[in-house]
Amino acid sequence: LAILSFGTIAKVISDTLEHIKNTKAVAHYDMCFVKPLDRELLHSIFKRFKAIMVFEEGVNSGGAGSAILEFAALERYHIPIKLEGIPDQFVSHGKTSLIHQELGWDTHGISKKISLLLNRTK
């Protein structure tokens, strides 16, 4: 499983990976920018992993996750891609850590999401 992160969520993901078992099956890539996408890196990730999970601190629709889906479609990669972005609905304002918790993006929530996807792609 490759986890691609866009934004400050990268720190939470790194912290989470330090505390979960089977981290050899998971690699985290902090994708520092969306435009332009690092196509060379994406090709190597898509060839190496059986599933991709994209975390972004933007709305799913039209964001980094959409760009990853478009890349996969254009390059004809056929592996599961799970998007974890902000739903296209009102999200209350507040401290980032509280919003992350509300979205299930705290250490516990991310760990569960990783485990679920790993179990589905065995």
Feature-to-residue mapping (PLM):
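Thiamine diphosphate
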Residues: 1-122
